[in-house]
Amino acid sequence: MISLKGKKIVDLTDELVARVARIDGSIEQGTDDAYGHKWLSEETINETDGTMEHLVGANIGTVSDWPIGGLSGHMGAHIQLGVRHNDNWTGLPDGMKGIWDVPLTTYYGEACVCVLDNVRGRPILPEHLSNVREGDIVLLTSCWSGDEQPTLVGDTAYWLAEEKKIKMLGVGVPGISWETNYDGPEPDNSPTHRAMTGNNIPIVYPLANIGSLKQDRVFFISLPLNVERMEGTWVRAIAIEEE
């Protein structure tokens, strides 16, 4: 029998509070994710059995700062791969996969914890990631925010993907500025996306509480929804470490 005795489970996802449009017309405001996105929902009645349910999303135009109403799989903590996400970019290799194409074992395993408080406002270099082993899931965070966050530059992203052959990249936000040149011209835009998804390495973010982990190696689990054709899905990410 599998036992978690002597182990501690750490939640690496921030709690979101949904904005709910109630049946009576009232609105209960919620909280934003790390990127300022709201979790929108609408209360309704299931006519089959009379139970109350919540539809994910809102009527178009009813939320001024998110007028499209619909939610994507990229709100809150989520995981993404390249197919149907950035395989429309030029310069990416053949053979890219979607979330649904890779084995479930891709999404859990041994992870190294990289707390980069000492890299304040500077590029993250391989020398800062000396605890990363080949095939690791890599969890990055720092205590910094805004312009003081360490930045994952393209050369280091490719080093992780192609030399260390990491299994998955998990990023604390705020804490790490993990993408550069995202608005640049192709094929030089978004090197971290290109390094990871071009090598079929999932990215999971925005994560929280990585800095609370006590060990620099943990067991990490972040399972996507089992929905084909979705380029990104919401996750509940956890780490398991020794107490």
Each model region followed by its residue ranges:
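Active-/binding-site microenvironments in catalytic and ligand-binding cores
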Residues: 1-243
